[in-house]
Amino acid sequence: ADNRRPIWVMLLSSYWQDGNSLGVDAIMTNYPEDVK
């Protein structure tokens, strides 16, 4: 990781990763078993 990155870049990266995890969890929860 590059510590020289601006704080907003790190915040955006963290938000993006969190959003992706939640999105994947939601998709896996809502899809039928045969689609997983």
Swiss-Prot record:
Disulfide bonds: none
Expression by tissue: Expressed by the venom gland.
Any one GO CC term of the record: extracellular region
Top EC group: lyase
Cofactor note (record): Binds 1 Mg(2+) ion per subunit.
PTM comment: Contains 2 disulfide bonds.
GO molecular function terms listed in the Swiss-Prot or TrEMBL record: lyase activity; metal ion binding; toxin activity
Cofactor(s) needed: Mg(2+)
Functional summary from the UniProt entry: Dermonecrotic toxins cleave the phosphodiester linkage between the phosphate and headgroup of certain phospholipids (sphingolipid and lysolipid substrates), forming an alcohol (often choline) and a cyclic phosphate. This toxin acts on sphingomyelin (SM). It may also act on ceramide phosphoethanolamine (CPE), lysophosphatidylcholine (LPC) and lysophosphatidylethanolamine (LPE), but not on lysophosphatidylserine (LPS), and lysophosphatidylglycerol (LPG). It acts by transphosphatidylation, releasing exclusively cyclic phosphate products as second products.
Note: LOXN1 (pI=4.41) and LOXN7 (pI=6.38) are not the same protein, but the partial sequence of LOXN7 (AA 1-9) is identical to the sequence of LOXN1.
Name of this chain's protein: Dermonecrotic toxin LgSicTox-beta-LOXN1/LOXN7
Organism name: Loxosceles gaucho
